Amino acid sequence: MKNKSVSLVFWVSLVICTIFVAFGEIFPKQLEKLTQNITTFIALHFSWYYLLLVLVILFVCVYILFSRYANITLGEEGEDPEFSLPSWFAMLFSAGMGIGLVFWTTAEPISHAFKLTPIHKAGTQSAINDAMQFSFFHWGIHAWAVYGIVALVFAYFSFHKGYPGLVSATLTPLLGEKAMRGPLGGAIDVLAVIATVTGVAATLGFGALQINEGLHFLFNVPSNFTMQVILIVITTILFTWSAWSGIDKGIKTLSNINMLLAFVVLIGLFIVGPTLYILNTFTNGLGNYIANFFSMSLRIPSGGQKFQWLQNWTIFYWAWWISWAPFVGIFIARVSKGRTIKEFILGVLFVPALVCFIFFAVFGASAIYLQDNHIADIAKAATETATFATLQHYPLGFVLSLITLLVIMIFFVTSADSATYVLGMLSSRGDINPKSFVKVSWGIIMALFAIIMIYTGGTQAIQNLLIIAALPFSVVIIAMIWSLLKSLSEEKPRNSNKVLIKHRDPDILEYRSSKHIDEN
């Protein structure tokens, strides 16, 4: 059989990404200005679109959860899940949140309460209440709904219908063979690859900044661009090795270890920190989150600093989740084979969101407690060092900081590790075992992307590029949802026979119901 594992999508995507890296290296200031102008335009004209889209995605997930399709198995009928529940949760959580969770659990609530606030005056009790509810909002079920719907589409078409693991293949019910084989399908897959590279490179950029600042804070290691490049190179070698060894050996092991370490820090801070204050903050924040769920979901201030806050936080986060959706979605689908749609949605939508709430309550409340009681000025700490600045004021602070630094490093590896696998799959005609050469190539490109982002403007440049990359791919997500609902509506009752037939391409096998056979 002819070897076709490396597709044209790989080479086209690689060329586009290389051109971007070269442009950023030669014209960094021009790139920074260009991305800032585009981001400003998108924020002014498309904020409403991002807010409505993410809310609609959440509604679709809930609808499917309670629909007659909820008991469909994402795989062959009667197939058992490949991974245990604890390993499954650990892998989807590590891939879905990664470095960002550690980066923002302290910095975001502090910023909402004492810096640029969403509604009330900074430093007031109302602003502190807002801080936790908006942190829950940004990292809660909205984010996981975006991941979940894309993952569900992939899992349904790949494991239930037997299509190849490509974004274009999921659009077959809408566009026919063109979506899977023609230029339009190739363009869609290239767009998915670029969105993934951008989203993951942004996380690598955040990770390099925080690891560098953590080393500087704890050990006075120099904090500069050179050190950040060194960190990216070292971690690139690590996650490339992990991706080379495969999901079961690499990602699964690292994810399990990292979740254990993350919970060690979480429980440790909960015990040595202001425990009662944390519990009260969590309860109050959860209540406010539920009470103001829809107002937060659809809130657009008229202008000024409040609109700037919306752009810097909510729109940025919604864009981040969308740009991460192809990567996280495909990875979650890959590790969710054998689960029912109901089990899948419940697991992906609610369990990780609750864990995020707990992390934000423990870390965020511990920081707010220090600030509000004038014990330490955490608000003046850099975003990258806010967590370390908080931990040092509690017993065992240095030990917890060391473990936190290790957690960030492993999150760094697991996020990029998962992404190299997904990028390899997208650029290898959906091959679930992409060539090591392809995975290594994407690891290098993501590292270069992250370096260019830091070089051209640090955190702000990263945020700008995420918002830009998410807009075109959001249209693809809408089409994927439409395609899923169309295909689900054609599902026969679960007692219909399934027959294995061959697709036009003899290398691709597809499961279809007897209804589809009649139609053909």
List each model region and its residues.
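Helix-loop-helix module between adjacent transmembrane segments
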Residues: 2-11, 15-25, 58-63, 97-101, ...
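Membrane-water interface regions at transmembrane-helix termini and the short interhelical loops
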Residues: 1-4, 28-42, 61-80, 132-137, ...
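Flexible loop linkers connecting adjacent transmembrane helices
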Residues: 33-39, 66-85, 110-133, 156-183, ...
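Hydrophobic alpha-helical segments of multi-pass membrane transport proteins
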Residues: 16, 49-66, 262-273, 355-365, ...
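Membrane-interface alpha-helices at helix entry/exit sites of multi-pass transporters
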Residues: 48, 85, 123-131, 179-190, ...
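Membrane-embedded translocation segments of transport machinery
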Residues: 180-182, 192-339, 346, 351-402, ...
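Long, low-complexity, intrinsically disordered cytosolic termini of multi-pass membrane proteins
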Residues: 498-520
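N-terminal alpha-helical transmembrane segments of multi-pass membrane transport
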Residues: 1-127, 267, 481-488, 514-519
